[in-house]
């Protein structure tokens, strides 16, 4: 079979609706110029998808944000090809979202979709977190008749000094991002189990063995994309650092060339020391940092004067790929980063010395932690969105009931 072509894009939306026209015009900027064919799968990882209250409440509160991103994909595709895509996955863990689209002729080969969510922000809530989707892709000549592709959207802890926290976030992903059951097929979009919990860390039943429920297992491709927040320095920049701020036109040997920053890149260091993202690889970085842009730069971008090509976000996957940033958009202080890659469809990938085992076992308490985080999210988000409070609502159950009632009639 021909390789499966993927286009994976990650973007921190800064809690704003995206500019559909501007985003669509540049959505495929990271695609190879000599490849006119549309990708088989498009994966969109978004962070700070919406204001925190809307993200925690989910449901209709997130519909405008996901709809605008879907419009971006549809418009970008229509500008290049006369073909349709099927939205297989639209899901989130708090403020982190994941969307998966399959080309219409490819969608029929996706036999099942499984999802998982985790929060590792404050008290394990979803202000920081990850959401994953696992697709079973039907193949010819493979022992099981399919291969699995796992996509994870993640937003890790910020700040230069928080390297250990980011490593702990990665460990949480391995231990508690648990896939449970097929919940959709290629013929329809994955929808949350119910509107009340769509923005939260959903609860449900478990099945199967742990070897296939975690993100690591044999005969599977794993891609992680997000605002991973690993920096190129262990300390925040000071005034004296302005002189060595990356220059696009600097010679590669010049200390001000962006490639010099990568010598102190935290993610590269932590991966080499087997402290984070065990067994993963990242395509070579050929673009300057994508964060953080000033308000003046965002205003310039709105007038078409912003930088045209800038890593705070990193799709992590196989080498031999096109890996680049998109222009700055006026709605965010981050720039989108995209990976265009083709993965081989092989009859079997035997477990050997190259197989990566899970660096940590699945947390046996993962479901209780997820359910607890769910309760922590919905009450404060209901307070922020509707003015609810414990003093007026009484018990937690009464608070939840009152928030649900208001959600049924409120229009965000």
Label each region the model flagged.
Residues 1-31, 119-121, 128, 385, ...:
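N-terminal charged/capping segments associated with class I S-adenosyl-L-methionine
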Residues 2-9, 38-42, 84, 95-97, ...:
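Core residues of folded domains in eukaryotic genome-function proteins
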Residues 13-16, 48-51, 92-94, 104-108, ...:
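Conserved beta-strand elements of beta-rich interaction domains across eukaryotes
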Residues 20-25, 55-59, 112-116, 153-156, ...:
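Short coil/turn segments at secondary-structure boundaries
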Residues 31-35, 40, 86-91, 120-124, ...:
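Beta-strand elements of modular eukaryotic interaction domains
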Residues 49-159:
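Structured beta-strand-rich core segments of catalytic domains in phosphoester-bond hydrolases
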Residues 75-83, 161, 165-394:
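Catalytic lobes of large eukaryotic enzymes
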Residues 388, 392-412:
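C-terminal single-pass membrane-anchor helix
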């Amino acid at each position: 079979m021909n390789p499966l072509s993927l286009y994976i894009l990650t973007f921190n939306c800064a809690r704003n609706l995206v500019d559909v026209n501007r985003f669509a015009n540049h959505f495929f900027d990271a695609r190879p110029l000599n490849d006119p064919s549309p990708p088989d799968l498009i994966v969109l990882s978004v962070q700070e998808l919406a204001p925190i209250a809307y993200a925690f409440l989910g449901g209709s509160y997130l519909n405008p944000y996901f709809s605008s991103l879907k419009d971006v994909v549809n418009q970008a595709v229509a500008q290049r090809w006369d073909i349709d895509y099927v939205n297989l996955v639209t899901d989130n863990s708090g403020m982190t979202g994941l969307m998966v689209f399959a080309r219409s002729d490819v969608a029929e080969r996706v036999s099942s979709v499984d999802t998982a969510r985790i929060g590792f922000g404050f008290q394990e809530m979803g202000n920081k977190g990850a959401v994953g989707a696992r697709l079973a892709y039907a193949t010819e000549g493979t022992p099981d008749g399919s291969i699995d592709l796992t996509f994870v959207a993640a937003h890790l802890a910020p700040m230069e000094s928080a390297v250990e926290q980011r490593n702990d976030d990665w460990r949480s992903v391995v231990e508690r991002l648990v896939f449970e059951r097929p919940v959709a097929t290629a013929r329809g979009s994955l929808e949350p189990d119910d509107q009340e919990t769509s923005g939260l860390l959903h609860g449900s039943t478990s099945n199967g063995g742990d070897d296939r429920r975690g993100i690591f297992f044999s005969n599977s491709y794993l891609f992680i994309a997000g605002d991973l927040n690993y920096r190129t320095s262990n300390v925040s920049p000071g005034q004296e650092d302005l002189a060595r701020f990356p220059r696009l036109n600097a010679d590669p040997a010049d200390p001000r060339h962006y490639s010099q920053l990568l010598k102190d890149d935290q993610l590269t260091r932590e991966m080499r020391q087997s402290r984070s993202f065990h067994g993963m690889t990242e395509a070579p970085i050929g673009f300057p940092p994508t964060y953080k842009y000033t308000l003046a730069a965002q205003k310039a971008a709105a007038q078409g004067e912003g930088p045209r090509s800038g890593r705070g976000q990193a799709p992590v996957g196989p080498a031999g790929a096109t890996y680049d940033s998109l222009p700055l958009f006026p709605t965010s202080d981050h720039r989108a980063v995209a990976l265009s890659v083709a993965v081989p469809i092989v009859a079997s990938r035997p477990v050997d010395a190259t197989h990566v085992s899970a660096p940590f076992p699945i947390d046996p308490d993962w479901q209780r932690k997820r359910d607890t985080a769910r309760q922590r999210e919905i009450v404060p988000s209901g307070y922020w969105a509707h003015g609810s409070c414990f003093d007026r609502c009484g018990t937690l159950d009464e608070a939840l009931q009152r928030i649900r009632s208001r959600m049924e009639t409120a229009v965000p």
